[in-house]
């Protein structure tokens, strides 16, 4: 059975999450792929209008006082029929809550968490880790890729210290260094970590064919 691919993007406000999502879609969007983007906070930047205006991409805003629930995900699956869901997660909320939702037996039958990304601002990392460690550690621990944004704001010694702390929390994560938010698109475009999975592309094509045949 084809499962909806889920990518979760975590990080505090102004860490570069929305810019990253724009860059990720620009690099990995497959022809006829239907994507739903769930935005759980309102940042300084917005989803690129060229992305929002695509017929096969739907942007949904989740109010701050609301949560991503099993019911919401079932509704999205039923009414939007996405191939991929990208969640921009609220950095002040515990990722474990979302993890519990995604671990629901029925949700796991239709959704599959593929990649978790975490973006952090090098200039505020230590402050947040000291004061909000319980919230910050969870997304780092479960992330596949951690992006260190605003590297230009700190010296090399500080960068190495941050990387050391990250690897203590998550020894297997990939760490990418970015000079500033304006450089995120270039890094995503050039990195081999962000690619179109050929097996996903094939499964997607087969699923589109199956749906078309079913609708006849």
Which positions does each model-derived feature cover?
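Phosphate/Mg2+-binding loops and adjacent switch elements
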Residues: 89-165, 170
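C-terminal accessory "lid"/substrate-recognition subdomains
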Residues: 155-216
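Short, low-complexity, intrinsically disordered N-terminal peptides in bacterial proteins
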Residues: 1-2, 215
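Nucleotide-state-sensitive switch-loop elements of NTP-binding domains
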Residues: 2-10, 15, 19-115, 126
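Short, hinge-like loop/turn segments at secondary-structure boundaries
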Residues: 53-56, 135-136, 192-195
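Structural signal for conserved beta-strand scaffold positions within catalytic alpha/beta enzyme cores
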Residues: 61-63, 118, 148, 176-179
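Alpha-helix boundary/capping detector
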Residues: 39, 47, 124, 128, ...
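Residue-level detector of flexible, active-site-proximal loop/helix-junction positions
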Residues: 66, 123, 182
């Amino acid at each position: 059975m084809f499962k909806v691919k889920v990518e979760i993007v975590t990080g505090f406000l102004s860490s570069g999450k929305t810019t990253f999502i724009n860059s990720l879609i620009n690099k990995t969007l497959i022809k006829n792929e239907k994507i739903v983007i769930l935005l759980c906070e309102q940042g300084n930047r917005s989803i690129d209008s060229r992305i929002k205006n695509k017929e096969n991409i739907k942007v949904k805003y989740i109010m701050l006082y609301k949560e991503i629930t099993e019911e919401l995900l079932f509704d999205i699956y039923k009414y939007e029929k996405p191939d991929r869901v990208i969640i921009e997660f609220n950095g002040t909320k515990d990722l474990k809550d979302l993890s519990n939702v995604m671990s629901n037996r029925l949700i796991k039958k239709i959704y599959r968490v593929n990649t978790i990304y975490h973006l952090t601002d090098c200039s505020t990392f230590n402050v947040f880790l000291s004061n909000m460690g319980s919230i910050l550690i969870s997304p780092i621990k479960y992330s596949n890729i951690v992006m260190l944004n605003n590297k230009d704001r700190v010296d090399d010694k500080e960068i190495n210290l941050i990387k050391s702390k990250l690897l203590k929390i998550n020894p297997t994560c990939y760490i990418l260094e970015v000079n500033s938010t304006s450089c995120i698109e270039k890094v995503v475009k050039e990195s081999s970590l962000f690619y179109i999975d050929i097996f996903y592309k094939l499964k997607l094509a087969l699923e589109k064919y199956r749906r078309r045949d079913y609708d006849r």
